[in-house]
From Swiss-Prot:
Its cofactor is Mg(2+). One of its GO terms (cellular component) is cytoplasm. This is UDP-N-acetylmuramoyl-L-alanyl-D-glutamate--2,6-diaminopimelate ligase. UDP-N-acetyl-alpha-D-muramoyl-L-alanyl-D-glutamate binds at L24, S26, H41, Q42, V43, N154, T155, T156, S182, Q188, R190. ATP binds at G113, T114, N115, G116, K117, T118, T119. One of its GO terms (biological process) is peptidoglycan biosynthetic process. Catalyzes the addition of meso-diaminopimelic acid to the nucleotide precursor UDP-N-acetylmuramoyl-L-alanyl-D-glutamate (UMAG) in the biosynthesis of bacterial cell-wall peptidoglycan. GO terms for molecular function: ATP binding; magnesium ion binding; UDP-N-acetylmuramoylalanyl-D-glutamate-2,6-diaminopimelate ligase activity. The lineage of its organism: Bacteria, Pseudomonadati, Pseudomonadota, Gammaproteobacteria, Pasteurellales. The modification N6-carboxylysine is found at K222. Its EC number is 6.3.2.13. InterPro entries: Mur-like_cat_sf, Mur_ligase_C, Mur_ligase_C_dom_sf, Mur_ligase_cen, Mur_ligase_N, MurE/MurF_N, UDP-N-AcMur-Glu-dNH2Pim_ligase. The gene is murE. Keywords: ATP-binding, Cell cycle, Cell division, Cell shape, Cell wall biogenesis/degradation, Cytoplasm, Ligase, Magnesium, Nucleotide-binding, Peptidoglycan synthesis.
Length: 488
């Protein structure tokens, strides 16, 4: 419960009001709530104030473009409406006050980068649990205490949802939380008032240019987590070109590399000296500021070696002993829809992965090749109503690294599938090894029935998702379920 006057530092109202929750969606308002009316990219919350009042809102905070109106109070009936200049920009701070600064009372780790956010945030929470902590996670797969995750709409929720969720986790006994921090979330100031014990940067490759317009804007949004927000420990992938540039400007950051010859300079550091890949993962010989050793990874692919080193480095920076981390690492498990291997006797191996950018697809195919003695198949599509420029690049990657390719539906949304396919096909030099099967289930069936035992089939793009968005409809669809049906 928070009093209206305390939240906005207002002079005493005649009748101060105790508020239960901050709510952005007028359809979810309950009696006693504060309705937050912000001007979003598509919808202006001010248009829904009447609806919120009808649902029982006890007060409203309304975004105004006039600085002269800031913190002025009007009334609709008996309900106070507080005008707030640049409300969206300051919403994280308001929610931080409303929910009593939950991130100050948690070990909070933010993870940003184009690829690897989900794997790293899930591994952080999983490893924290193995170390005896109660962990929660927020991100693409969902939000909640580890093992009790509820599906989420966006990678990074609204400023209010984040603070509210952190408060819920804290009251449920969590002492550790990992959160995926998207470029949208950073650009829109949704994590502005969070107190990060650490932040991890994975990599930066082409994605979301439909929103950011340029790679420079995209990189600048990511960088804010390390230069403008309250972040104590900065863990950077030094093998990424942007990460390496940032390290030159961040002397207090920790450098993590898979390059044995990496020159660490003045930074704290972690680097792989030798990596032995095998069917069950990898054995990573490393040296670091905290000591040397061998880390046994249960995850396949070189990029997952990088992910795991970033996670272990972060936990080492918190003071967890190296021997404890190496002992507990053996119990780590893979992440749903992230290089998830499905195998049946005498059948091709199927790998389901979320790869939906050119860089991620390349890394997934290279990782799949490690486990392929026959031909490597790649099934992929591209999302509709999204960055068209990456579609031919995805085709180029598939053609370079796979022997057999099937182009299919991803989430076409409201864009014609034929347009998406045309954009993808424009990237192929030779169509001889390419098939187009728009129906995703039929594409998976064809590959499984055509491939032989030593082949590997990478089904890319959807990962953990159990739906397809076709038009404005969301229909049930799971790559894993379809693959299992045809492997049995």
């Amino acid at each position: 419960m928070k009093k209206l006057t305390a939240l906005f530092n207002l002079p005493e109202l005649k009748n101060d009001i105790e508020l239960h929750n901050m709510v952005l969606d007028s359809r979810k308002v309950k009696a006693g709530d504060l309705f937050v009316a912000i001007k979003g990219h598509q919808v202006d919350g001010n248009q829904f104030i009447d609806s919120a009042l009808h649902s029982g809102a006890s007060a409203v905070v309304s975004e105004t473009e006039l600085s002269s109106e800031h913190l002025t109070v009007a009334f609709i009936g008996n309900v106070p409406v507080v005008k707030y200049h640049q409300l969206a920009r300051h919403l994280s701070s308001l929610a931080d006050v409303f929910y009593d600064s939950p991130s100050k009372n948690l070990t909070l780790v933010g993870v940003t980068g184009t690829n690897g956010k989900t794997t790293i945030s899930q591994l952080l929470a999983q490893w924290a649990e193995l170390l005896g902590l109660r962990a929660a996670v927020m991100g693409t797969i969902g939000n909640g205490l580890f093992g009790q995750i509820v599906e989420a709409k966006n990678t990074t929720g609204s400023a209010v949802e984040i603070q509210s969720s952190l408060s819920t986790f804290k009251h449920a006994g969590a002492d550790f939380t990992s959160i995926e921090v998207s470029s949208h979330g950073l650009a829109q100031h949704r994590v502005e008032a969070l107190h990060f014990k650490a932040a991890i940067f994975t990599n930066l490759t082409r994605d979301h240019l439909d929103y950011h317009q340029s790679m420079e804007n995209y990189a600048a949004a990511k960088k804010r987590l390390f230069t403008e927000l309250d972040t104590q420990i900065k863990v950077i992938n030094a093998d990424d070109e942007i990460g390496y540039q940032w390290l030159t400007k961040l002397p207090d950051a920790i450098a993590v590399s898979m390059n044995a010859d990496f020159k660490v300079g003045s930074h704290q550091w972690m680097k792989a000296i030798n990596i032995h890949y095998h069917f069950k993962g990898a054995d990573i010989t490393f040296e670091s500021s905290w000591g040397n050793g061998v880390l046994h990874s249960p995850l396949i692919g070189a990029f997952n070696v990088s992910n795991l080193l970033l996670v272990m480095t972060t936990l080492l920076s918190f003071g967890y002993p190296l021997e404890n981390l190496l002992a507990t690492a053996k119990s780590l498990k893979g992440v749903c829809g992230r290089m998830e291997m499905i195998q049946y006797p005498n059948k091709p191996t199927v790998i389901v992965d979320y790869a939906h950018t050119p860089d991620a697809l390349e890394k997934a195919l290279i990782a799949a090749r490690e486990h392929c003695q026959g031909e490597l198949w790649c099934i992929f599509g591209c999302g509709g109503d999204r960055d068209r420029g990456k579609r031919p690049l995805m085709a180029q990657v598939a053609e370079q690294f796979a022997e057999k390719i099937i182009v299919t539906k991803d989430n076409p949304r409201t864009e014609p599938q034929s347009q998406i396919e045309a954009d993808i096909v424009a990237g192929f030099k030779n169509m001889e090894k390419v098939g187009i099967i728009p129906d995703r289930a039929q594409a998976i069936q064809f590959a499984i029935e055509s491939a032989v035992e030593n082949d590997v089939i990478l089904i890319a793009g959807k990962g953990h998702e159990h739906y397809q968005i076709i038009g404005s409809e969301v229909v049930h669809f799971s790559d894993q379920e379809i693959a299992l049906d045809f492997l049995k």
